[in-house]
């Protein structure tokens, strides 16, 4: 990634944040007559980041981001495991059973922590042992779904680097960094389900051996969460690549999810080791299926 492209990404991110802040101030400065003539754009209850959102228990679908807000000063810890020692699509039943369905094998693990540094604004850091990748990201929860808004919207920016956030990978090859920018859109369907659309653009997804036209990937993540009990959900997502570098298959995942207080646990079936935005852009190997889990804990 060139210095110019990284600077452009940072400029876009700051512009998005400043635009949201300026818009909020402009609404606050409306005249009393205007306030009496029109209902507020967002009620206090809609704007409460700590409000329980029964159909949105976690900050991810499986790997894709949601629009769940985080109260200012609060935090959230997220752990993912993908057991890659057994491939459920290629290995026979005896191999799968003898390896305890994959739990005996090695795992791709990601640790993530996010904190709300301002109202509606989250800072996130994640580290996975897949390529020793570290990802820094920010999320601005611009719109909360409620009585005055038919959907939720969050803006996302990130940058990640392999080999503990270096420009060289674990083999010593200079591959640069992979910044991303996108949005997460959410919509509740009554009291039963929520759906997500996450268009995301990632730069530098094919840094080795490709022409300039293959250096970027644009994908649109699609997700759904269906409630089958008061705090139990069936979850699914897919991340089809629309343009740019598109190796292998699109990432797909399914999960059975349970919320208990501030904890969320998901038993996951997924076709990729990917958890970061650039890894999702690079897709999955054909005929691959792993078992794993997600575990999250809110601190508020």
What is each stretch, according to the model?
Residues 10-21:
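Bacterial N-terminal signal peptides
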Residues 1-7:
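N-terminal secretory signal peptides that target proteins for export/translocation
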Residues 20-33:
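Signal peptide processing junction and immediate N-terminal pro/mature segment
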Residues 214-220, 249-252:
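Charged helix-capping and loop-helix junction motifs
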Residues 30-170, 176-182, 186-205, 226-229, ...:
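Transmembrane beta-barrel domains of Gram-negative outer membranes and organellar outer membranes
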Residues 212-213, 222, 227-229:
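Surface loops at the rim/top face of extracytoplasmic beta-rich domains
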Residues 195, 209-214:
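Short helix-loop boundary/capping segments
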């Amino acid at each position: 990634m060139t210095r110019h492209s990284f600077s452009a990404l940072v400029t876009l991110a700051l512009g998005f944040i400043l635009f949201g802040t300026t818009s909020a101030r402009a609404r606050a400065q409306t005249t009393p007559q205007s306030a009496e003539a029109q209902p507020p754009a967002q009620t206090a209850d809609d704007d409460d980041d700590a409000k329980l959102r029964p159909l949105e228990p976690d900050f991810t679908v499986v790997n894709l981001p949601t629009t769940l807000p985080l109260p200012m000063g609060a935090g959230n810890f997220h752990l993912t495991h993908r057991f890659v020692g057994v491939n459920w699509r290629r290995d026979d039943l005896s191999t799968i059973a003898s390896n305890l369905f994959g739990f005996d094998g090695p795992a791709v693990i990601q640790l993530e922590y996010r904190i709300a540094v301002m109202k509606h604004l989250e800072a996130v850091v994640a580290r996975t042992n897949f390529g020793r990748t570290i990802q820094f990201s920010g999320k601005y929860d611009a719109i909360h779904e409620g009585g005055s808004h038919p959907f939720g919207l969050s803006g996302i920016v990130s940058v990640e680097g392999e080999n503990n956030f270096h420009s060289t990978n674990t083999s010593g090859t200079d591959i640069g960094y992979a910044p991303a920018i996108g949005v997460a859109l959410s919509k509740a369907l009554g009291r039963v389900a929520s759906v997500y659309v996450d268009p995301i653009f990632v730069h530098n997804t094919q840094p080795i051996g490709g022409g300039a036209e293959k250096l970027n990937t644009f994908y649109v993540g699609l997700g759904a969460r269906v409630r089958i009990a008061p705090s139990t959900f069936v979850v699914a997502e897919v991340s089809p690549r629309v343009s740019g570098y598109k190796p292998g298959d699109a990432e797909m995942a399914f999960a059975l999810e349970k919320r208990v207080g501030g904890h969320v646990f998901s038993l996951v079936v997924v076709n990729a080791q990917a958890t970061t935005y650039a890894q999702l852009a690079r897709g999955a190997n054909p005929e691959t299926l792993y078992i794993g889990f997600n575990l999250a804990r809110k601190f508020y």
